[in-house]
């Protein structure tokens, strides 16, 4: 069962000035802001269930995008941090989220990892799609 903690926590964090947010929240805010400028709408942030947490859940044109955000001190590539165990947890959490939001079950699902360098002067986020996740 999911929690509403994610939605209210995400809204709360978005109101905190970026420099006062913890590093992980800063990275999520950067990715969320970037995607929202591209027309994606944020549905949930830090949504959790017994299987795990979804950092960002967004939608645009009947597409659902789930983003796992990884902060890094540099742009050293980090999608390998999403190992097979983490992928299984992520897939189960996505299934739980979709079960709680049945109106979106027929939307095209995309899952991505965003590697975000902190501080922002280190560059823009890098993206990697995760295929065959769920």
Curated annotation (Swiss-Prot):
InterPro entries: Restrct_endonuc-II-like, tRNA_endonuc-like_dom_sf, UPF0102_YraN-like. It holds the Pfam family UPF0102. GO terms for molecular function: nucleic acid binding. It comes from the Bacteria. Belongs to the UPF0102 family. This is UPF0102 protein SYNW1051.
């Amino acid at each position: 069962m999911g929690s509403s903690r994610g939605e209210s926590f995400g809204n709360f964090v978005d109101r905190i000035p970026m420099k006062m947010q913890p590093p992980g929240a800063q990275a999520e805010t950067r990715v969320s802001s970037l995607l929202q400028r591209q027309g994606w709408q944020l549905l949930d942030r830090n949504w959790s269930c017994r299987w795990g947490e979804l950092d960002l859940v967004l939608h645009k044109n009947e597409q659902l995008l789930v983003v796992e955000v990884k902060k890094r001190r540099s742009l050293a590539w980090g999608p390998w941090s999403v190992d097979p165990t983490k992928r299984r947890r992520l897939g189960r959490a996505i299934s739980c989220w979709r079960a709680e939001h049945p109106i979106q079950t027929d939307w095209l699902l995309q899952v991505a990892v965003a590697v975000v360098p902190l501080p922002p002067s280190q560059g823009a986020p890098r993206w990697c799609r995760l295929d065959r996740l769920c």
